[in-house]
C-alpha cells in the first residue's frame, strides 16, 4: 500500500475533486456523463416512493421550486432548550454554533406522554437490550422488513424477515455471535446483506412465491475459525444508479464495503458469483473480486462509497476521515487521496454525504456537503468538501438541572432527498427531526430547524421508509391513506383538501426496547411568510383539479421545493469562520469593573456596564445599556375553523418571553395557541364569510388562515358541533382517526361532484331534526337544500346559490322521496343509533366499520402482533351495524312487548335515511326513486323558461309553495313524533329484553358453575341453541340467518368472558377457604401437641403402664444373663494382660542394659582423637588472632584519617556555598523592599507636588506587586485589594489572592474588605473561570457570603453583578461538564440564584 506521507496533499486533493467533479460549475452542462434522474442510497436502504402531490414534469417543478428567500442574520452562538411537548416543533436554528439541550420530559424515568404528532402501530414484540448499537438492528425495503433477534432456547442470533404486504414471516440463521449489521441494497431491492460479529458475510435474495417468502443465498463468505468477535463491523452498499432506459430498478449495485476493526474490504459480488458456485466459501480461498484498505490506527466506525464505486470514505475512532481511491479489477493498491480530523481527534460515529438520491440533478456534483459526528453523535458538523471548512456545528447536551444527567447517545439517518436528518437518542424516549437546506451555487448548507417528538420507549435503531410531502388535515389525525383519498384518479381534490395544510410525513420502522413498531410522524415544517403563497382559491363553478397547475401547487402551496430538486438556499448568507465556544475575541473581551464603578447609584451603571450578557433595569434610551434578547417560539396552530365570536386581535395573543443566553437562547413554548374548538354549524353562525378571516398585520398563513381563504369563497359548511373535551383530548383524536374518519372518503367523493352549498336550513327545529342531521353529517356529504327541497322546507337560499343546489343530500333525498310519495301513509325512519349508543361505539369497534375498512383502496399493511395473532383473528368477522340494530328492534316483539307505531321492514330502513347505509345502497335507492326527483328537475327547467302569462304563473307558484310549506310542516311534525316514539319504544324494548335475557343467562351461569368447569363447553353450546331458537321465533325470515350468525359470534365470547371471572372467583374462594382450613388445622394441631397438659397426661399414662413390667424384665435379664457373662470375660482379660506385661517388661530391661554398655564403649573410643584436635586448633587460633588484630588496627587508623580529611574539605565548600546563597537572597529582598519604599516615597512626594494625581495604571507591575506586598505585610488588606482591583489587571488580583489565604481575609469577625471592594472582586474573578478555577471559586464563595444586603450601594449593584456571575458559571458548566469543580460551580450558581431572586423588582 502506498504511504500517505509520500503523496503531495495538494495533488491528492485536486485528484479527489476531479473524481467527484467538485470543481465543475453548478450551472454548467454535463453532457459527458449525464446522470439519471433517480438514485439510491445504500446507507438508507434505497429509494423513496414518489410524492403524489409533486409528480409531474420534473423540469417545471424544478423551475417553480426555486424561491427567493430573504437572507438570515446568522448569529455566532445559540442555545435551544427543548420543552418536551408538541410546541417543540420546527424551532429555528439561527447560528453556526448551536447547542441543543434535551428536555426533562424526554428522560426514560419521565411520566410524560408521547407526542400527538406520532402514530405508532406495533409490528412485533421482542425485548432488546438497551445499549448503543453501532450497526443497524433493522433493515427496510418496500417489500420486506428484516430485524435481528436471538433465539429463546439457545440464544443464537437470527434475522426475522416479514413481508410488508402479507405479514408472512421467515427466519434466516447460521450466524456466529450476534448480527453486527444488516442492510438492503435499496428500497426496491430484494437483496439483503447481513454481517455477524465474526465477520461472516451473508447476501440473500428474497422473493414472495405463492404467499411464502423464499430466500436464496447469493454470497456467503466465511472467516477463519477463531476470529475474535467484534461488534464494530458495518455494511456499506454502493449507491445504485440505473440507466435512464431501464424500466425496472430492482437490481442493485454489485459493490459492497465491509468495515472491520482494523481494515475495510470492498467486494464485487458479481465477480464472486462468477468464480464460485457453491457456498459458503472461506475467505482464504478467494483470490479475486475484493480489495483490502488499511490505514487507520483504531477500529473503523463509518464509511461511504461513491456512486461509481471508485472512492471509499472511511471514518475511525482515531478521529480521521480518509478518502481512498480503489480499483478492484486492477492490481493497484488503494491510495489515500485526502485525510483530516473533523472533530479534533475525537472518535467519529457519523459520516453522511448530503446527496439528493431521490431525484439526482445531472448538473449537481456528488459529495458536495458532508455531515460528520463524534462522541456517539453528540456533536455534528456540516462541511464543505471544496474548501474543507466547517459550515455549522450542532451539539447535543443533557438537561443540566436534571438529577440524572445522562449524555445523549444518538443514532442518525439522512433521508434520500437530503432534506431531513432524523436522530434517535438511545438514552431518551425521543426522536429529533432536523431540516437541512443546501445551496450548491453559493456553497452553503446548514440545518434550519429542529423538531422534537416524544415517544413511549427509547429507539435503539430505525429504518426510514418514506419521507414525503403530505396534506395535513385541520385535526391532524387522519392517516396518509385517507389524506391521499382526497386526490382521485383524475386529480380531483376531496372534501378534506380545502381544510388542509402543507406538511411532512415520515414513515419509520423503529426498534424499541420492548417491541418493533411502525411509526408515522406528521408535522408542519417551518414556513417563511415571504415565501409561502396561499392556496389558490376557487369559485363555486370551478372544478378542483390539478391538471397543469400541479407543479405550482407542489412548489408554492406546499411551501417547499418540489421533490427531486435540490432545496434552494438563496436566503443563507456567508457563514463565518468557526470559533471556539468559549473563545473571546477582541470585540467580546469582558471589561473588568473597578470598585469605583460600584460607588455610584444605579443611574450611572448604564454608562459603565458594557458586557453583552448583563441586563439593566434602567431606561431604554441609554445607548450603552444592553438587554437580553427574547426569542419566543410557538408551534404553528393547525386547528380547524375559527369562530368569529371567539377570535382575538393579534395584540391579545402574547407569549411569555424566555431568557436567551449568549446571544440567542431559544426556548420552545410550553404550549401552543389553541383556536376555538367549535366547528362551523349552519344556523348557529349566520355571520358572513368575510368575518371569519383573521385580521392582523404580519400574520403567518397557517392551516387556519388557509381555511379562512376557503371560507371567503364557500358558505359555512354543515359540520356537527364538537365538544371542547373531544376536540382537545388526544385519545379522542386518535380514536377518531381510526374509526369514523375511515368511512368518509367514499361518501365525500360524491359530495365533491356536487360543489359546495350555502348555509344549512334555519327553519328546522333543533330538537326534531338535529339528531338525525348530526348523524348524517358525520357519514354523508355536506347537506345543502336543493331547489326542490328549499321551497318545501321554507328555506331562503342566498343569492347566487341556485346553480349549486341541483343535487340533494342524503337527508334531502329521503325527505323529498317521502314528500313526493302518492301514498298517504308515513313510515318512520330508523332510530338515531349513532346518537344514543355513541359511548358503546367508542369502546367496542362495530362490524360495519371493520368491513368498510377492508373496502378502502388505501390502507396500512395488516401487521399483526406475533404473540397475539391467533387471538386477534378470532374477532375479525362481524356483520353490519344496522343489521344488529334492526335485529334488536325486531326481536323486542318476541318478549311480550308491542310497538304502537307501524314499523318499516329492514329493507326500507336501509334505503330511507339510515346513517350507516353504504354509498352503494344510497345510490341504488336514488336510482329506484329517481322518477320523482327527475320530474321536479324537469319542472324547474320548464319554469326557468319565461312563459307568457307571468302573473298567473307566479300566483299559482305561490299557492303551491304555501301548500308545500304546510304539508312539509305537517310531515316534519309527524316524522318527529314518530321518530321520538319509535326511539323510546325501541329503547325500552331493547332494555327489557336485555334485562330478561341477562337474568336468564345469570341463572344458567350459576347452575353451570355449580355443576363444574368441565361442562362449560357443553353449556355454551346449549345456551347458543336456546338463544337461536328463542330469537328465530321473533325475527323476520330475512334477518334469521344474520341474527344466528351474530349470536354465534357474540354470545359464546360473552359467556366465556362471564364464565372465566366467575370460575376464577370460585377457584379463588375455594383455594382461600382450603388455605384457611389448612392453616387452622395446623395451628390447632401444633397447639394441641405443644400443650403441657396433654404431654403430662401421655407421660403419666405411659409411665404407669410400663413401669412394673419393664422393671421386672430388666432385673431378670441382668441377673441371669449379663452378670455371669461379664464376670467371666473380665477375669480372662485381666489374666492375659498381666502375663503379657510381665514378659514384655523383662525383655525390655535386658535389651536396654546391653545397648547402654555398647554405646559407652564406642563413645570413649571416639572422644580421644577429637580432644587432641581441639587442643591443636585452639593454639593455632590464638596465634592468628594476635596477628590479625595488629594488622586491622593499623589499616583502620590510616583510613579514618583519610576520610576525615576528605569530609572536612567538602563540608567547608558546601557551607560556603549555602552561606553565599542565603546572604544573596536576603540582600536582594532587602534591596527590593528598600527600592519599593524609596519608589513609594518618591511617588508620594511627586503626588504632593503635582497638581493632578498620577494614574496608577502607569506604575510598573513589579513596583505595584512590591507595594501590595508591603501593604499585606503591614496588615492593610483592604488597601492592598483595592490597589490591585483599581489597576484592572486580573493577574495582579490573582497575585494578591495567591499571596493571602482566604481564611486570613474572611476569618476575622468584621470583614476587612469594604462592600465596593467585594463587588469589584466578585466581578473581576468571575470574568474568566478558565484558569485557577479552584482559587477563584473559593474567593467567590467567601466574598458572596460577606456581602451586606442592608448597604444601599451593595443592594443597588448586586443584581447586575450576580447576573453576570451566574452567566459566566453557566458558560463554564457548558464548556466543561465533567470538570471536578463542576459541583462547586453549581452550588455557587444556586447560591447566587437564591440571593438575587428576592432582590429583583
Curated annotation (Swiss-Prot):
SMART domains to which the protein is assigned, alphabetical: WD40 (SM00320)
Modification N-acetylalanine occurs at: 2
UniProt keywords, alphabetically: Acetylation, Coiled coil, Cytoplasm, Nucleus, Phosphoprotein, Repeat, WD repeat
Residue(s) carrying N6-acetyllysine: 125
Biased composition (Low complexity): 609-628, 677-689
Cleavable signal peptide: none
Region of interest called Disordered, as start-end residue ranges on this chain: 23-42, 545-565, 603-628, 662-702, 717-741, 778-808, 868-946
Annotated coiled-coil segments of the chain: 954-1025
Residues found modified as Phosphothreonine: 693, 727, 821
Subcellular location: Cytoplasm, P-body; Nucleus
Pfam families: EDC4_C, Ge1_WD40
Residues with the Phosphoserine modification: 3, 6, 560, 565, 583, 585, 676, 708, 723, 725, 729, 741, 844, 871, 875, 879, 887, 890, 892, 967, 1380
InterPro entries with a match to the protein in the record: EDC4-like, EDC4_C, EDC4_C_sf, EDC4_WD40, WD40/YVTN_repeat-like_dom_sf, WD40_repeat_dom_sf, WD40_rpt
Stretches forming WD repeats: 121-164, 167-206, 217-269, 287-326, 335-385, 389-426, 432-475
Bias kind Polar residues: ranges: 663-675, 722-741
Cellular component per GO, a single term: cytoplasm
Chain segments carrying region Sufficient for nuclear localization: 913-934
One GO biological process term: deadenylation-independent decapping of nuclear-transcribed mRNA
Superkingdom, natural source: Eukaryota
Function: In the process of mRNA degradation, seems to play a role in mRNA decapping. Component of a complex containing DCP2 and DCP1A which functions in decapping of ARE-containing mRNAs. Promotes complex formation between DCP1A and DCP2. Enhances the catalytic activity of DCP2 (in vitro).
Subunit note: Part of a decapping complex consisting of DCP1A, DCP2, EDC3, EDC4 and probably DDX6. Part of a complex consisting of DCP1A, EDC3, EDC4 and DDX6. Part of a complex consisting of DCP1B, EDC3, EDC4 and DDX6. Interacts with DCP2. Interacts with RC3H1. Interacts with NBDY. Interacts with TEX19. Interacts with LSM14A. Interacts with DDX6. (Microbial infection) Interacts with rotavirus A non-structural protein 2; this interaction probably plays a role in the sequestration of EDC4 in viral factories. Interacts with rotavirus A non-structural protein 5; this interaction probably plays a role in its sequestration in viral factories.
Family indicated by similarity: Belongs to the WD repeat EDC4 family.
Protein name: Enhancer of mRNA-decapping protein 4
Organism for this UniProt entry: Homo sapiens
Lineage of source species: Eukaryota, Metazoa, Chordata, Craniata, Vertebrata
Encoding gene (name): EDC4
Amino acid at each position: 500500500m502506498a504511504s500517505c506521507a509520500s503523496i503531495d496533499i495538494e495533488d491528492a486533493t485536486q485528484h479527489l475533486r476531479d473524481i467527484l467533479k467538485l470543481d465543475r460549475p453548478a450551472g454548467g452542462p454535463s453532457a459527458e456523463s449525464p446522470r439519471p434522474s433517480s438514485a439510491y442510497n445504500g446507507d438508507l436502504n434505497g429509494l423513496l416512493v414518489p410524492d403524489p402531490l409533486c409528480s409531474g414534469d420534473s423540469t417545471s417543478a424544478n423551475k417553480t421550486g426555486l424561491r427567493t428567500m430573504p437572507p438570515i442574520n446568522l448569529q455566532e452562538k445559540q442555545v435551544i432548550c427543548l420543552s418536551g411537548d408538541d410546541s417543540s416543533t420546527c424551532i429555528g436554528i439561527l447560528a453556526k454554533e448551536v447547542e441543543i439541550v434535551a428536555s426533562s420530559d424526554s428522560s426514560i424515568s419521565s411520566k410524560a406522554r408521547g407526542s400527538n404528532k406520532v402514530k405508532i402501530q406495533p409490528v412485533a414484540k421482542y425485548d432488546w437490550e438497551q445499549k448503543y448499537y453501532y450497526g443497524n438492528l433493522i433493515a427496510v425495503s418496500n417489500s420486506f422488513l428484516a430485524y435481528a433477534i436471538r433465539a429463546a432456547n439457545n440464544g443464537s442470533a437470527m434475522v426475522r424477515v416479514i413481508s410488508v404486504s402479507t405479514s408472512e414471516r421467515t427466519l434466516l440463521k447460521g450466524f456466529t455471535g450476534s448480527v453486527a449489521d444488516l442492510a438492503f441494497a435499496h428500497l426496491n431491492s430484494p437483496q439483503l446483506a447481513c454481517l455477524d460479529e465474526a465477520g461472516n458475510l451473508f447476501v440473500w435474495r428474497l422473493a414472495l412465491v405463492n404467499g411464502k417468502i423464499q430466500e436464496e443465498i447469493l454470497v456467503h463468505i466465511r472467516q477463519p475459525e477463531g476470529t475474535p468477535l467484534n461488534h464494530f463491523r458495518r455494511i456499506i452498499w454502493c449507491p445504485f444508479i440505473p440507466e435512464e432506459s431501464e424500466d425496472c430498478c430492482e437490481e442493485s449495485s454489485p459493490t459492497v464495503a465491509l468495515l472491520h476493526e482494523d481494515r475495510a474490504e470492498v467486494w464485487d459480488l458479481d465477480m464472486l458469483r462468477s468464480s464460485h458456485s457453491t457456498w459458503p466459501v472461506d475467505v482464504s480461498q478467494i483470490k479475486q473480486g475484493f480489495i483490502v484498505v488499511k490505514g487507520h490506527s483504531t477500529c473503523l466506525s463509518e464509511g461511504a462509497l461513491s456512486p461509481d464505486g471508485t472512492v471509499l470514505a472511511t471514518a475511525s475512532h482515531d478521529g480521521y476521515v480518509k478518502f481512498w481511491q480503489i480499483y478492484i479489477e486492477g492490481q493497484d493498491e488503494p491510495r489515500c487521496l485526502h485525510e483530516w480530523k473533523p472533530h479534533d481527534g475525537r472518535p467519529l460515529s457519523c459520516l453522511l454525504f448530503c446527496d439528493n438520491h431521490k431525484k439526482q440533478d445531472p448538473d449537481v456534483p456528488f459529495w458536495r456537503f458532508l455531515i460528520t459526528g463524534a462522541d456517539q453523535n453528540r456533536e455534528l458538523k456540516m462541511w464543505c468538501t471544496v474548501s474543507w471548512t466547517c459550515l455549522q456545528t450542532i451539539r447535543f447536551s443533557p438537561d443540566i438541572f436534571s438529577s440524572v444527567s445522562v449524555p445523549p447517545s444518538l443514532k442518525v439517518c439522512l433521508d434520500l432527498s437530503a432534506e431531513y436528518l432524523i436522530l434517535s437518542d438511545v438514552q431518551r424516549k425521543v426522536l429529533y427531526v432536523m431540516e437541512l437546506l443546501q445551496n450548491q451555487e453559493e456553497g452553503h448548507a446548514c440545518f434550519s430547524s429542529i423538531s422534537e417528538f416524544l415517544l413511549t420507549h427509547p429507539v435503539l435503531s430505525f429504518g426510514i421508509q418514506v419521507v414525503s410531502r403530505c396534506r395535513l388535515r385541520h385535526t391532524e389525525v387522519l392517516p396518509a391513506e385517507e389524506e391521499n383519498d382526497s386526490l382521485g384518479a383524475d386529480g380531483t381534490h376531496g372534501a378534506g383538501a380545502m381544510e388542509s395544510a402543507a406538511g411532512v410525513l415520515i414513515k419509520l420502522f423503529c426498534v424499541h426496547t420492548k417491541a418493533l413498531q411502525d411509526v408515522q410522524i406528521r408535522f408542519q415544517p417551518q414556513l417563511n411568510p415571504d415565501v409561502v403563497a396561499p392556496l389558490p382559491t376557487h369559485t363555486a363553478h370551478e372544478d378542483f383539479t390539478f391538471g397543469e397547475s400541479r407543479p405550482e401547487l407542489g412548489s408554492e402551496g406546499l411551501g417547499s421545493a418540489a421533490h427531486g430538486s435540490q432545496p434552494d438556499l438563496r436566503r443563507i448568507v456567508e457563514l463565518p469562520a468557526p470559533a471556539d465556544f468559549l473563545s473571546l475575541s477582541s470585540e467580546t473581551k469582558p471589561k473588568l469593573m473597578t470598585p469605583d464603578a460600584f460607588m455610584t447609584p444605579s443611574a450611572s451603571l448604564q454608562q459603565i456596564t458594557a458586557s453583552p450578557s448583563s441586563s439593566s433595569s434602567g431606561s431604554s434610551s441609554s445607548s450603552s445599556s444592553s438587554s437580553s434578547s427574547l426569542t419566543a417560539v410557538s408551534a404553528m396552530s393547525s386547528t380547524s375553523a375559527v369562530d368569529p365570536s371567539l377570535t382575538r386581535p393579534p395584540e391579545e395573543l402574547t407569549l411569555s418571553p424566555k431568557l436567551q443566553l449568549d446571544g440567542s437562547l431559544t426556548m420552545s413554548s410550553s404550549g401552543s395557541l389553541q383556536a376555538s374548538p367549535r366547528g362551523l354549524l349552519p344556523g348557529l353562525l349566520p355571520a358572513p364569510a368575510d368575518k371569519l378571516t383573521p385580521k392582523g398585520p404580519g400574520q403567518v398563513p397557517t392551516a387556519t388562515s388557509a381555511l379562512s381563504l376557503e371560507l371567503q369563497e364557500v358558505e359555512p359548511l354543515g359540520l356537527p358541533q364538537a365538544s371542547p373535551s373531544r376536540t382537545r383530548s388526544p385519545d379522542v383524536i386518535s380514536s377518531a382517526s381510526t374509526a369514523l374518519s375511515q368511512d368518509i372518503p367514499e361518501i365525500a367523493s360524491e359530495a365533491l361532484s356536487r360543489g359546495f352549498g350555502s348555509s344549512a336550513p334555519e327553519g328546522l327545529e333543533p330538537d326534531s331534526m338535529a339528531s338525525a342531521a348530526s348523524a348524517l353529517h358525520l357519514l354523508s356529504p355536506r347537506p345543502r337544500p336543493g331547489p326542490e327541497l328549499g321551497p318545501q322546507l321554507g328555506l331562503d337560499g342566498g343569492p347566487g346559490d341556485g346553480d349549486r343546489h341541483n343535487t340533494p343530500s342524503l337527508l334531502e333525498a329521503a325527505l323529498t322521496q317521502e314528500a313526493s310519495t302518492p301514498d298517504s301513509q308515513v313510515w318512520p325512519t330508523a332510530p338515531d343509533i349513532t346518537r344514543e349508543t355513541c359511548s358503546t361505539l367508542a369502546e367496542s369497534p362495530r362490524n360495519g366499520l371493520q368491513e368498510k375498512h377492508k373496502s378502502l383502496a388505501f390502507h396500512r399493511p395488516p401487521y399483526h402482533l406475533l404473540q397475539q395473532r391467533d387471538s386477534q383473528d378470532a374477532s375479525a368477522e362481524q356483520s353490519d351495524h344496522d343489521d344488529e340494530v334492526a335485529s334488536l328492534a325486531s326481536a323486542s316483539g318476541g318478549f311480550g312487548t308491542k310497538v304502537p307505531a307501524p314499523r318499516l321492514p329492514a329493507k326500507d330502513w336501509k334505503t330511507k335515511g339510515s346513517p350507516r347505509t353504504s354509498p352503494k345502497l344510497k345510490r341504488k335507492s336514488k336510482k329506484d326513486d329517481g322518477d320523482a326527483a327527475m320530474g321536479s328537475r324537469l319542472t324547474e327547467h320548464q319554469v326557468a323558461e319565461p312563459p307568457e302569462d307571468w302573473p298567473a304563473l307566479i300566483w299559482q307558484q305561490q299557492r303551491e309553495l304555501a301548500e308545500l310549506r304546510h304539508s312539509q310542516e305537517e310531515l316534519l311534525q309527524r316524522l318527529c313524533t314518530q321518530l321520538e316514539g319509535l326511539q323510546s319504544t325501541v329503547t325500552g324494548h331493547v332494555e327489557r329484553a336485555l334485562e330478561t335475557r341477562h337474568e336468564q343467562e345469570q341463572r344458567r351461569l350459576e347452575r353451570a358453575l355449580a355443576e363444574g368447569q368441565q361442562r362449560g363447553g357443553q353449556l355454551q353450546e346449549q345456551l347458543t341453541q336456546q338463544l337461536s331458537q328463542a330469537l328465530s321465533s321473533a325475527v323476520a325470515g330475512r334477518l334469521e340467518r344474520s341474527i344466528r350468525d351474530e349470536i354465534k359470534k357474540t354470545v359464546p365470547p360473552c359467556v366465556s368472558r362471564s364464565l372465566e371471572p366467575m370460575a376464577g372467583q370460585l377457584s379463588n374462594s375455594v383455594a382461600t377457604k382450603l388455605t384457611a382450613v389448612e392453616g387452622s388445622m395446623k395451628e390447632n394441631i401444633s397447639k394441641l401437641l405443644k400443650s403441657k397438659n396433654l404431654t403430662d397426661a401421655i407421660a403419666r399414662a405411659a409411665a404407669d403402664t410400663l413401669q412394673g413390667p419393664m422393671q421386672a424384665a430388666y432385673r431378670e435379664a441382668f441377673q441371669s444373663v449379663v452378670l455371669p457373662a461379664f464376670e467371666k470375660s473380665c477375669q480372662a482379660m485381666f489374666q492375659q494382660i498381666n502375663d503379657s506385661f510381665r514378659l514384655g517388661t523383662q525383655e525390655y530391661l535386658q535389651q536396654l542394659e546391653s545397648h547402654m554398655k555398647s554405646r559407652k564403649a564406642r563413645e570413649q573410643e571416639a572422644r580421644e582423637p577429637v580432644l587432641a584436635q581441639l587442643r591443636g586448633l585452639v593454639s593455632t587460633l590464638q596465634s592468628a588472632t594476635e596477628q590479625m588484630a595488629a594488622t586491622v588496627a593499623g589499616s583502620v587508623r590510616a583510613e579514618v584519617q583519610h576520610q576525615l580529611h576528605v569530609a572536612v574539605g567538602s563540608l567547608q565548600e558546601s557551607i560556603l556555598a549555602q552561606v553565599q546563597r542565603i546572604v544573596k537572597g536576603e540582600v536582594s529582598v532587602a534591596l527590593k523592599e528598600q527600592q519599593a519604599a524609596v519608589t513609594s516615597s518618591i511617588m508620594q512626594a511627586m503626588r504632593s507636588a503635582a497638581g493632578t494625581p498620577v494614574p496608577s495604571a502607569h506604575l510598573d507591575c513589579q513596583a505595584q506587586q512590591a507595594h501590595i506586598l508591603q501593604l499585606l505585610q503591614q496588615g492593610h488588606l483592604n488597601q492592598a485589594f483595592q490597589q490591585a482591583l483599581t489597576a484592572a489587571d486580573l493577574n495582579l488580583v490573582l497575585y494578591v489572592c495567591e499571596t493571602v489565604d482566604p481564611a486570613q481575609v474572611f476569618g476575622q469577625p468584621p470583614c476587612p474588605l469594604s462592600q465596593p471592594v467585594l463587588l469589584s472582586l466578585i466581578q473581576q474573578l468571575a470574568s474568566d473561570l478558565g484558569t485557577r478555577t479552584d482559587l477563584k471559586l473559593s474567593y467567590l464563595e467567601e466574598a458572596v457570603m460577606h456581602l451586606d444586603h442592608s448597604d444601599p450601594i451593595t443592594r443597588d449593584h448586586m443584581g447586575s453583578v450576580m447576573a453576570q456571575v451566574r452567566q459566566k458559571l453557566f458558560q463554564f458548566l457548558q464548556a466543561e461538564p465533567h470538570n471536578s469543580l463542576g459541583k462547586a460551580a453549581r452550588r455557587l450558581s444556586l447560591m447566587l440564584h437564591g440571593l438575587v431572586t428576592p432582590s429583583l423588582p
